[in-house]
Amino acid sequence: MIKKASLLTACSVTAFSAWAQDTSPDTLVVTANRFEQPRSTVLAPTTVVTRQDIDRWQSTSVNDVLRRLPGVDITQNGGSGQLSSIFIRGTNASHVLVLIDGVRLNLAGVSGSADLSQFPIALVQRVEYIRGPRSAVYGSDAIGGVVNIITTRDHPGTEISAGWGSNSYQNYDVSTQQQLGDKTRVTLLGDYAHTHGYDVVAYGNTGTQAQPDNDGFLSKTLYGALEHNFTDVWSGFVRGYGYDNRTNYDAYYSPGLPLVDTRKLYSQSWDAGLRYNGELIKSQLITSYSHSKDYNYDPHYGRYDSSATLDEMKQYTVQWANNIIIGHGNIGAGVDWQKQSTAPGTAYVEDGYDQRNTGIYLTGLQQVGDFTFEGAGRSDDNSQFGRHGTWQTSAGWEFIEGYRFIASYGTSYKAPNLGQLYGTYGNPNLNPEKSKQWEGAFEGLTAGVNWRISGYRNDVSDLIDYDDHTLKYYNEGKARIKGVEATANFDTGPLTHTVSYDYVDARNAITDTPLLRRAKQQVKYQLDWQLYDFDWGITYQYLGTRYDKDYSSYPYQTVKMGGVSLWDLAVAYPVTSHLTVRGKIANLFDKDYETVYGYQTAGREYTLSGSYTF
């Protein structure tokens, strides 16, 4: 199941150590401060999802994994592969930092926000998810939270899997990890996924001409990694992956003109690293390169026709991070450099552009008696907007054994994307969007229930909005977000329960109107149990009311979208010690709902899959 953060500190063993759902030692996370540390020493709310969780849920997309997590609200323009957005604690989709193995997702650099509908679920071995500001560690984008997708496998062997389902869904996957001698490990993976999909547009809502077709999705993925331990403290790795996706979608149709309704995405990433893992000092140097080519075109004319568009971006990064144990805690420091380059025509920008950013940061964690203190500061020097600084601090007080109060404050920012700076309506004088956040939380273990309740406020200024009168982007928006988050997990006999509740009041601070596409309330519940070797799982999610715009006519009207309750049922059975079969019914009661106005969801879906390991 999802493993919620316990309160075990790195330097003392208290009653909190009983909170960890997995076995001791406490689960290690790397995302909070770039180095492995017990999850319980991170004062920000942190959730870890393992590959075992993903297999148990039988998720076929990254979005299906993330939608189950506290504070996450997913919207999507239809089914698999269709454009999606991630809202964390009511912030914008562009206020979520998505990392792949600790490196910023390349695709987010063009549009300003990450669309994880395109990222292959086959690559995901682990997800570390931190809520709240983290710009003081990572720089731009980390306003609402950080999602770190980790591709490294943690178990040797070979697995072959296949799956089939509704809308002609099919998936085939082969992966292997082999040990070469005592010090070298090789991992290889290949994956193929395809669905015919369904017609995503709900006609009459969008005003577009009917396009009665199936909006399908095809993805092909390759992955390889080589890891080597030179000595007991020195190690290195080389890793690469790529995917080739095709998505069909519904677009606005103009008679006599090409209908651009197909997306073709090529993406490849390569990284290499060297690590020193001493008893007191740790250091790592990581370099990476990624290249994406994103075509949108009419398949009757091809992706090289004048009607087609191409967004092409290359990203280069270098990260040097260091950590030293001092007293009852540690101090970390590092520098990272990033260069993003676009080809001419990307994001409708006539010329190609380079943007460089160099950041230096300092982090610290220290325990003093019943108190735990955490802090970080960072300075970024950007080739476009100059220097920008952020900082954050948190304190935890174990006022009674097994119970803790946490208070935190942090600043964060979001840099303008390349389209906002240099596009047809761009403004090269834009400043970063800025955020100030406060949070207070209580957490504890009561009668076997591991719980946390927190309240937060986030004031965002200098939001980049489009001005209809001047036809330019300006820093003129403000947002005020207030929220309450409650999480709990507990066991009752053979049943394991995980539940969360989110209340988010996200508003335009100038007009006092709700921000679009955010559900005001969400309830999420996961029930797992084993009966006669069958592993059962029930997932419940309530999505509250939200608002969106009807873009079928101008001026655009605000529409209210009602809430919905969704149920999933999953079951798995180990036929042998090597062969496991699984089945799932998503949207069990076939509820009709939308998360983006005018775009249909799939309705009830069935999947059947099997995996063989050796």
Curated annotation (Swiss-Prot):
It holds the Pfam family TonB_dep_Rec_b-barrel. SUPFAM superfamilies: Porins (SSF56935). Gene3D superfamilies: TonB-dependent receptor, beta-barrel domain, TonB-dependent receptor, plug domain. Disulfide bonds: none annotated. Ca(2+) 2 binds at D213, D215, Y249, D250, D261. Cyanocob(III)alamin binds at L83, S85, N92, V110, S111, A251, T309, R517, Y551. Keywords: Calcium, Cell outer membrane, Ion transport, Membrane, Metal-binding, Porin, Signal, TonB box, Transmembrane, Transmembrane beta strand, Transport. PROSITE patterns: TONB_DEPENDENT_REC_1, TONB_DEPENDENT_REC_2, TONB_DEPENDENT_REC_3. One of its GO terms (biological process) is monoatomic ion transport. GO terms for molecular function: ABC-type vitamin B12 transporter activity; metal ion binding; porin activity. Its main location: membrane. Ca(2+) 1 binds at D199, Q211, D213, D215, D250. Residues 155-614 form the TBDR beta-barrel domain. A motif (TonB C-terminal box) lies at residues 597-614. The chain crosses the membrane at residues 158-165, 169-178, 184-195, 217-227, 232-248, 263-277, 279-296, 309-325, 328-337, 353-369, 371-381, 385-400, 403-417, 434-443, 449-458, 473-490, 494-509, 517-529, 535-550, 558-572, 585-596, 602-614. GO terms for cellular component: cell outer membrane; pore complex. PANTHER family: COLICIN I RECEPTOR-RELATED, TONB-DEPENDENT OUTER MEMBRANE RECEPTOR. Involved in the active translocation of vitamin B12 (cyanocobalamin) across the outer membrane to the periplasmic space. It derives its energy for transport by interacting with the trans-periplasmic membrane protein TonB. Belongs to the TonB-dependent receptor family. BtuB (TC 1.B.14.3.1) subfamily. This is Vitamin B12 transporter BtuB. The gene is btuB.
